[in-house]
Curated annotation (Swiss-Prot):
Changing residue 27 to Q: In HYPCK, RMD2 and MPDT. Sumoylation with SUMO3 by PIAS4 may reduce agonist-induced internalization and desensitization of adrenergic receptor ABRD2. This is Caveolin-3. May act as a scaffolding protein within caveolar membranes. Interacts directly with G-protein alpha subunits and can functionally regulate their activity. May also regulate voltage-gated potassium channels. Plays a role in the sarcolemma repair mechanism of both skeletal muscle and cardiomyocytes that permits rapid resealing of membranes disrupted by mechanical stress. Mediates the recruitment of CAVIN2 and CAVIN3 proteins to the caveolae. It is a peripheral membrane protein. It comes from Homo sapiens (Human). Residues 64-114 are annotated as: Required for interaction with DAG1. There is a cross-link at residue 38 (Glycyl lysine isopeptide (Lys-Gly) (interchain with G-Cter in SUMO3)). Changing residue 78 to M: In LQT9 and SIDS. Residues 1-83, 105-151 are cytoplasmic. The keyword Ubl conjugation applies. It comes from the Eukaryota. Belongs to the caveolin family. GO terms for molecular function: alpha-tubulin binding; calcium channel regulator activity; connexin binding; molecular adaptor activity; nitric-oxide synthase binding; potassium channel inhibitor activity; protein-containing complex binding; sodium channel regulator activity. The gene is CAV3.
Length: 151
């Protein structure tokens, strides 16, 4: 009985990962477009003081801009949203696949192979460079610098 409940719970968890509910009100919950895509009328069109158009022109321009942007976005997202989502899903799946099955194993392989070389390199440094720099340090340790301020 307990094993069946555990299996049902696992099935629900796996299902929840792939069938995530989406928020239809807040469609940018991580605020990725907060600073990037800000295209309200006031962000694009502005009249400086002293060069105002007629109030009616300003109101109609505002309405035209807002409505045309709204419907153009809706039309483009209707026509291209699903194909582009498919394209981006495929692209990110390919990138994830390459990262998981090629990049990470190559890096791990490189780190394993470079570890052997690093031991040899470290041995060479300790054998040749350490005595050389220790001797140079002894030679330079007897150098004295005197600073005088002349007026």
């Amino acid at each position: 009985m307990m094993a069946e409940e555990h299996t049902d719970l696992e099935a629900q968890i796996v299902k929840d990962i792939h069938c995530k509910e989406i928020d239809l009100v807040n469609r940018d919950p991580k605020n990725i477009n907060e600073d990037i895509v800000k295209v309200d009328f006031e962000d694009v069109i502005a009249e400086p003081v002293g060069t105002y158009s007629f109030d009616g022109v300003w109101k109609v321009s505002y309405t035209t801009f807002t409505v045309s942007k709204y419907w153009c976005y809706r039309l483009l997202s209707t026509l291209l949203g699903v194909p582009l989502a498919l394209l981006w899903g495929f692209l990110f799946a390919c990138i994830s696949f390459c990262h998981i099955w090629a990049v990470v194993p190559c890096i791990k392989s490189y780190l394993i192979e470079i570890q052997c070389i690093s031991h040899i390199y470290s041995l060479c440094i300790r054998t040749f460079c350490n005595p050389l720099f220790a001797a140079l340090g002894q030679v330079c340790s007897s150098i004295k610098v005197v600073l005088r301020k002349e007026v």
